[in-house]
């Protein structure tokens, strides 16, 4: 285990993330520009596809980090049976949900019930498929809909804020089921679909298109919001949320619905809108 990963066990996760949020929203010109320039240089951020390509035009670091893309920079797969990749990034893992468990890395797994915070909510995904997509600091940080769905419920599951970088994924047991996360349950024409936005060290929040910034007060209780009957319908490929720093999204599909694209594997670089799976 690397020194950085070892340190994440003892670091004050929430304090650091609160400080990161304050910096991310700072409008002090020297502060925000130093952050933008540092991240652009360190991670090789490409602004040529951004709707605003001038790094000096963003009022805050967060505005830069959650930047929009130019129209047409990403297009959905033309096959109507394609279940779409929800974000730019890299496949951490994908595959079947076997015996209710989701593979994290060699020797590491966690249950769907742990991830979703609910045994009953996890049951429909047993023997289904999952995909875990890691968004690095250089990536486009908006998450989109794999398929058209009606929002049924969101569940805020409190937890730690470990790094979700590759070393942590390999070494921290049950990482994604331990970090703070926002579970979004959708009803679709093929049944339930879940998109899980996993927080991480320095992630200052998740912002959804239906309720804005989701930064619940820290606590040890799961918080649910019921959206049934409220008509929150999001079309396939539409934006659903954005990370206010890099992290991970996990998509769960029920069994017998779709087959994962054969060209995908762990460590594959992916782009929003390409085929994640195809309807059976």
From Swiss-Prot:
Per its UniProt record, the required cofactor names are: pyruvate
Give the positions of the site Cleavage (non-hydrolytic): 246-247
Please give the pathway this protein is involved in.
Phospholipid metabolism; phosphatidylethanolamine biosynthesis; phosphatidylethanolamine from CDP-diacylglycerol: step 2/2
UniProt entry tagged with the keyword Lyase: yes
Family annotation (Pfam families): PS_Dcarbxylase
Q: Which cellular compartments is it found in?
A: Cell membrane
- Keywords of this protein's UniProt record, alphabetized? Cell membrane, Decarboxylase, Lipid biosynthesis, Lipid metabolism, Lyase, Membrane, Phospholipid biosynthesis, Phospholipid metabolism, Pyruvate, Zymogen
- Self-association state and partner proteins as the record states: Heterodimer of a large membrane-associated beta subunit and a small pyruvoyl-containing alpha subunit.
Chain's role: Catalyzes the formation of phosphatidylethanolamine (PtdEtn) from phosphatidylserine (PtdSer).
The molecule here is called Phosphatidylserine decarboxylase proenzyme
Q: Which organism is it from?
A: Xanthomonas axonopodis pv. citri (strain 306)
Q: What is the lineage of its organism?
A: Bacteria, Pseudomonadati, Pseudomonadota, Gammaproteobacteria, Lysobacterales
Its gene name is psd
